Amino acid sequence: MKIEAILFDLGKVLIDFSFETAVQALYASCSISRDRFEEVLWDRAWICRYERGEICTSEFHRYLRQTANLNIDLPDFCKVWSSVFLPGLMVSENLLAWLKRRYPLILVSNTNEAHIEFIRSNYRVLDYFDQHIFSYQVGSLKPDPKIFERAIAASGCPAKALFFTDDREENIVAARRFGMQVHQFQTESKLVEALQQAGVEAGEFVRG
């Protein structure tokens, strides 16, 4: 089926990130062991609640203060927590602009309010997308079906007419179950090849 809309993941597709420096900075303000700190920080129950929007950033910060003895105030926590994002984009603005002129673009991301606030203030990438499906706003994390259902509904297109790219295999598998045309992201050049194979005239972008 002809592609009618294109869906992108955010982290590790559009913007690269690394938690190493942020984790070290947060750990430096704690009074527990590094192993225990990482257990607390990456507790799946709390991270998932945060990224589903069940708790806000201040509540997540309070949890870390109480459980990991984190000695850092909320504004500084937000600054450190958002320092994970690396400069530049993994997909060029030229490609995004080229696609935007021809297709509806939809962003589908597991994320949280602090990270999105930071990205809005420091990158232009969100402006290329017609709709944003953020996990903390819809109450669902990829690869759960609900977030994909929201994305399909937002597109107004049949799932088979959607092209979806994400770096994580489990999300690709979930999207494929809905019938989407999918590509596990590695590089921009491979994404362009996959778009071409799906019938998107991305070759014009390459030639231009």
What is each PLM-predicted segment?
Residues 47-90:
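Metal-dependent phosphoesterase signature
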Residues 1-4, 112-113, 117-208:
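Asp-based, Mg2+/Mn2+-dependent phosphohydrolase catalytic module
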Residues 75-106, 145:
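Short, acidic loop-to-helix structural element flanking the phosphoryl-transfer center
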Residues 21, 25, 45, 59, ...:
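Alpha-helical elements of Rossmann-like donor-binding domains used by nucleotide-donor carbohydrate transfer enzymes
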Residues 7, 106-108, 163:
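Conserved hydrophobic packing residues within short motifs/helices of P-loop NTPase cores
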Residues 9-12, 53, 99, 107, ...:
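Generic structural signal for small/hydrophobic residues in well-ordered secondary structure
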